[in-house]
Each structure stands twice: as C-alpha cells, then as structure tokens.
Amino acid sequence: MGQKGCPIGFRTAVTKKWRSLWYGNKQEFGKFLIEDVKIREHLRKKPSCQGAAGFIVRRMSGKIEVTIQTARPGLVIGKKGAEVDLLKEELRKLTGKEVWVEIAEIKRPELNAKLVADNIARQIERRVSFRRAMKKAMQSVMDAGAIGVKIQVSGRLAGAEIARSEWYKNGRVPLHTLRADIDYATASAETTYGIIGVKVWINLGEKTSTANANTGATAPAAQ
C-alpha cells in the first residue's frame, strides 16, 4: 500500500501533522470541512500566495486561524501589511467569521516537495526541457541534504502524440517505511499540447519517534 497510497495521508498522525486542526460534531463537521476547502481554494488563486506550499487551518471559539507556509513571506505580507490585511478581509467575508492569518517561512525551499513540483511545472510551461528541469531540481534537492528524491512527469511529454510517464530517482525513498519522513506533492503544467502532471517525493530522513509528528524533529536515515 505504501507504493499506491498518498505518502502524506499514509503517515498522518504517525510522522505527519494534520493540516486541519479542529474538532466538529455531526452537525458541524461537514460545514467545517467545506469551509476549509473554500479557504484553501481561495488562497491558491491569490497571486500573493503563489509561492505557498501549504495552508494549516485551526478553529477556536468562533475564530479561524490560517497559517500560510511560504518561501516568500514578503510577497504574502505585502507593502506595510496591505496584502495580508486584504486576505483577512476576504476570508472574513467568505466564512462570516473572524479570521487571523499567520505566515510561516519555509527556510529551505529545496526540501519542500510542493515548491519543487511547482518549480518544475513552471519551467515546463516556459518550454524548458522536462528532463533538464527534473535533473536540475533533483540535484538541488540532494545538495540541500535530502536522503533521497524521486520525480515523475506524465502527459504528452515534448509534444509526443502518445502520453507517457518518465521518472528519475536518486538516493533512498522508502514509501513502505512509516518512520521515514517522506514529503510528497503534485503540480500541473499547462502547455499547448495539454496538461503535464508532476509528482515529487523527498525523503528527509527518519523520525526518531511517533511523538515527533507534533514537533517535526527528524534524524538522519541510516545509510
């Protein structure tokens, strides 16, 4: 199952944190879930959030706290905080509740699967060779200290008549090992030939224990 299922969902509450931090009863759960989806969809469409890797939603006594994980915090905050204030107001109108927005900077974007996948997709859209984009991204990930990386692209590669998939792998990416801290993300490139899908798996090491799912502590994987 490790090869077929989503690595993030497979490890949630084991070595990965939940991305929605709240509890709802039978009457509230569906409403809260739809609200979370609307919040994330709205943020993904915002130009200021284009460099964002993820969004964490917390709920507390009628208030919502949204944490934006990004490698470019200045873009999200805007001049004198104008962009983040606009985001708060838009989310307040969307949900009808008071919304707090916090920014969490990603210190090492080369080790974030979402940012790597988005970077490859944007290069493919600019007509850069998909093999060159994959190899360059893979080298950057390994140079940043990853234990292993796997990158796959699918679609009408280089304008081919028949769609196919190609992948490259470097190092160890053990998808069955639950203690392995695997970051996974997808992205899509819109080209004149159609959509090119991009998938990225990054092995960041091994969690020292399941308790570290809440702390994010990692230990280097055994060589």
From Swiss-Prot:
Highest taxon above the source species: Bacteria
Keyword set includes Protease: no
Protein name: Small ribosomal subunit protein uS3
Function comment: Binds the lower part of the 30S subunit head. Binds mRNA in the 70S ribosome, positioning it for translation.
Subunit structure, interactors included: Part of the 30S ribosomal subunit. Forms a tight complex with proteins S10 and S14.
Record lineage: Bacteria, Pseudomonadati, Chlamydiota, Chlamydiia, Chlamydiales
Domain KH type-2: 39-117
UniProt-listed PROSITE patterns: KH_TYPE_2, RIBOSOMAL_S3
Key words of the record: Ribonucleoprotein, Ribosomal protein, RNA-binding, rRNA-binding
Family: Belongs to the universal ribosomal protein uS3 family.
GO process terms (BP): translation
